[in-house]
């Protein structure tokens, strides 16, 4: 009865529940140690797991005999020895520092940065309505959004109420001889904000992406956790204050980057001072992720293609290290960290060029960049030899009348019609015939062996390359079209780059990877895809594409080294007679010499190259990248 007078049943349940739920108590085990019959005292041991680790303590409680029943003499100390009515059990979370994402040279791609937090002190805000409208206009948000923040329950007259994060203007950037115009404009905006009474701008720690647009699709970004995230990742250490990787490598390496929050459970007195620590879990900061990516190359590829709808993959052709992964157009990932307005989001989301679309993860019609692959399959299967003359058919050819009005066309005639020349002149007719000689069964078997209709063993999930919509080439015309990279063939650019590694690695297709390793060594994805002699013969052919003056890739040839490569222009149209279709321009280029000090393989694809030079447009762009990579020849 005395216990009931001390605390109501509802309050008893509420206090106990609040404590045990707050510390996330699990696996509760209470064991009686001793019982003193004379004093009716029970000694017991309590043990349970919490968010901060194991709690284990001894305690005792007295009982009274009333109405032939034993009843507990309850007090707060039953919950924990020494706990009083005014004490609180508190949980303090120590947030783990998120790991950095670094390039191969230690340059930060994602990590700790500083932004400016624009806030308002309500008590100092003069002409409230007009000031809020002006602040909203300068920040690109709605006045009602500001009002919502200012009327939150916790806000007092002297509170600093954060409204929006914006880019921090660094003095060094302003002192440059020719400061960036956007930085100057940002400085002017902040000066206007500070002239409004009650506005303050302070530094705030944020996740920063120094390469901005240049690596957005690769690195990705984090955002504050949502209720859905907390539900989905329950028990994984996320709190309302956590961020989580949403896209790109921020998402792929979320587990490694996030670390483990530290936690302390303690008893606080009525003034909030710590009386006793019950449990403590040490904070474990997230791991840094070092990539094979070269930030300078990543930036250079982006700058050269930023006005196009394109994607580029760069690799070391002898190790499988991925040096760059670029998709354009792009977006500044920092905008997601600062907080994007609906207007900004709509503009980004409705842009016809689709800057949010990650093109390097997709599959595309490869056009003539597929011809070296067909050449290797034909030689490997002994369907033909490199010296077999396929005969000069002019600019148009069909196998027989069963093809109806369908003809394969090509741009150039030459002699003799052998493999090396067919690669130099990018002869569609030669490779259509080559595909027919290979045959449907062998073509499907070989392409399946090369990873078509299978996933690429890579950290980032890529769309699967395919040679047909249903894993079977349906017709003779479809087979012929496959020979020059048309028909239903769709290839992921990383996959194509991997297949090209076989031409300078004795026929072995290398496995691509992103995590940096000291003294990198190649790992084979597909061993002996082609024989050494076959890969060498194809390599000589694609060397000629770049180094023979008639070659479609001759514009990129260099005097200081030998390059190998293949151009491609893929037609995207409804029928052979369609003149309104678009074209994809491709170029694959690499350094085939293992002695080269800066080995590189680049595969680039640009949409809508019709009327601007086809694949030649891409060759010029990649030439500028290689000139920067090697130093102009």
Indicate residue ranges for each PLM-predicted region.
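A short acidic/glycine-rich loop-to-helix N-cap element
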Residues: 607-620
